Amino acid sequence: MHELAMKKCIGKPIPEWDAAHRLEIDQSTGPNLQDFGTIFRINSIFMDVIEPSFLEKQWFIFGITISFAAALNGPYIYSYAYLGSDPLSERLITHLMALTFIFIFGGITWKFGRGLFYGLRHQPIRFHRSLNRLYAIRSRRYFAKPGEGDIVWEAPWSTESIFCLHREETSFGVFFHIRHYTLSDNGNVARVFSIGREWTGYGQIGMALAQWNYWCAYMNDGPGDLPKPMLFHTQQETLREAFLFSLYSFGLRAPAIVRLLMMPLILVFTVMRVLANATCRDPIWPESIERISQIAPDDPYAEPRPGTPVGWGDTILAQQRGEYPDNPQAPVKDWKGEMDEQKNAAAWLENPAAATRRTARGRP
């Protein structure tokens, strides 16, 4: 979800649906824990995670490009009216149309295009288990002082923190993602950011809950017993990776015929993603965060390490060779609730608090 789309919550109470579907850091939400492609790197000290727009930014770039092209029609319409011999009244109408194109579509381009171009290639969210805090890079700092880094928000990892499963209903369907809310003194939303990836439709709620369990297991118990992530995303995106991001945005397991039909659009998405990345730079952590994020050279849990596949292409090839697990997951320790992931997700959606109480009592 685009950052500006979340700002509609600022100054208002937490959305009612979100408030009813809070995620607790000390209570498992399902029988499994699994990562579904949200991780850059992991070690004993911290874990860097993506935010939703990282996977889908080619769609935003495509929309911004169309909006920019529409805005360029304004000067064309104006020149047509200026050079024409139409009556003054008709030329005034044409001038008004030109200004409308410029201001409306130009405004959309400026509002939603900032950050996609000349911003950051990615905005990692750092789960820092040593300090029980989250550090989220939110935007590029263009005139930073030495050591200041980019703009970072902090959030405590505590039972008082407000994490929710957010539901977004659009004309393309229902989407879910995990959010953190920071409230002001009057109880309204002061800050909000999303973590990880989006989940499409109610059928993927079980996956979202398994992903939350994965992050909680890391923060609460460390990386020792975690299954491998689905993949480690590259922080140095290549042309091949840009193509695979665009290809898989139509579905990881989309039929070959669908991919062939969508190939022209996939290629356009690839070019746009590459061009946008070329205008951006890598994020810079403030020195204060870098100092507390030093890992030991012999950290046994530091990944990716030499030999570990990174990115879509290398990971898929490693899986085909049997060198990297396919669909790695693990059961939640001491889980007492419903063992069927879909049934558990349905019960949690209907009433999260009641589902948690039943699980605590050992009832499915």
Regions found by a protein language model. Give the residues of each.
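Short, hydrophobic/proline-enriched secondary-structure or compact coil segments at domain edges
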Residues: 40-56, 176-178
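Acidic, Ser/Thr-rich low-complexity segments on the non-lumenal side of membrane proteins
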Residues: 135-173, 312-327
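Short, surface-exposed beta-strand/loop "edge" segments at domain boundaries and coil↔beta transitions
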Residues: 2-3, 48-62, 144-145, 185-193
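A membrane-cytosol interface segment of integral membrane proteins
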Residues: 155-230
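Juxtamembrane amphipathic/hinge helix adjacent to a transmembrane helix
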Residues: 42-45, 215-250
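Conserved beta-hairpin
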Residues: 108-149, 153-154
